[in-house]
Amino acid sequence: MIQKIKIIFVLTSLILTLPFCLNAQEVIPLKNTHGLYNAYVIPIREQSRIDIQLVILSGSYDENEISGIAHYTEHLAALSSDAAVLQEPRQRDLNAFTSQVSTVYTNTGNQDDLDRLMRLTRAVLDTPQLSEDFKKSEIDIVKREVYYKERNAPSRWLNRLVLQKLYNSKYGRAETPVADLNKLTVKAAIDFHNKHYIPSNSMIIISGNINESLAQKKLTEYFGDTKKTKRVMDSWLNQRPENGLESITKISTNRLLSNQLSFAKFFRFDDLSDILGMQASFFIASDIYNSHLNNLLYLDGNTAQSFSQSSYIAINGDIEYTASLIPFDGVTLEDAYKSLRMSIKNLDTNNITQKEIEIARSKNVAYTKSLAQSPRAYLDFFQNLGSDGLPPVSPKEFSKMIANAPNEDILKIISAFVADSPSAVIL
């Protein structure tokens, strides 16, 4: 996923049948996907390696009883796959990653390694076969990873609290992974695997030094026995805050080094006529409103000594904005919150100039193109849209979408951000 903002997508049947250009390469849907949700090949002649990405179309948002169970399941599936094919687990699950909406397993090699890569990929869908002691010991590894992240970013806890207040929940779009660490069990992970790690909830992206014919042959060889079933539905897409919510919670804690507020706001972009265009417009719009608030509260103002922002979008037009603010000495958290709310309210789209839009557009086009220089970024972009079933896209292709994003849609998103909508703050 792109680190600047995270973009969340689900299926749209129209574009699953369309070929997408990737520089000189083509994103080709494989004709026979067998039981898989979808499969693509991306021939890249300039590369000597082959990358196979298995995208499980479920992640932490799909947890409904135990936060962190998707992460623990990822560990077991990755290590079991390694043990089955390589006869021993690799040192860690370095080839796997759990996000909010998906779990991605990546295996890389050259053409001589293709059968081994396919076996590793196929084995992820098999129920993890590891000793009971090994499976239980991996819970301690997950705990250490979570605690390490918490120590390095104490504000993660505050950000989780504000999302729990916004959605009135501890699961789905909100989570509580630290509190639930002692709830992790082998049985819960196997249950999660049995429900979500099915072919029809999985997508494969094969890229690099390979052609369509060979990719189809290998897909049939290793997944030809799979049967199509229903995909696991994303129930979190229906999880929204209460209309008119303005939750204000004051706490006292010694877990943070400085006084800090965490703010979350939920709003919507209702025009879903162009799903791909919506993401590009959002990329620019969020850059503009982030810049305005950063100028008012941090660069030009006397409110924040530290200010960070993030925005997320879902395919149904739901948008989530979060901000963390550490005020200057002498500025109370209550005053900082008032300044933040007033800065959002006063962001008038009539004052946003064509030049400002084009600067934001050019900046994001350049940023996205720069990611094309990194092989890792290419893989991230391939899986980005694929995280919920859409065809892969490259950094350069996404930069074209940004360049063509309509000004009208950009301003509509900013207007929706400014308008009154459900929010929560922790002071």
Positions of the model-derived regions?
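Histidine-acidic residue clusters that define the catalytic metal-binding segment
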Residues: Q25-K31, L163-S202, W236-Q239, F269-S273, ...
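Extracytoplasmic
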Residues: Q25-V27, H34-Y37, Q47-Q53, E65-I69, ...
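An aromatic/glycine/proline-enriched structural segment found at the starts
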Residues: N168, P199, M203-D271
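Acidic/histidine-enriched segments that form metal/cofactor-coordinating
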Residues: R90-F192, M342, Q354-R376
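M16/MPP (pitrilysin/insulinase) zinc-metallopeptidase core fold and M16-derived inactive scaffolds
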Residues: Q53-Q111, Y171-E175, N290-Q305, I315
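Bacterial N-terminal signal peptides
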Residues: I8-P19
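Bacterial N-terminal signal peptides that target proteins for export
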Residues: M1-F9
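C-terminal regions of mature proteins
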Residues: M203-N209, L347, N351, K355-L427
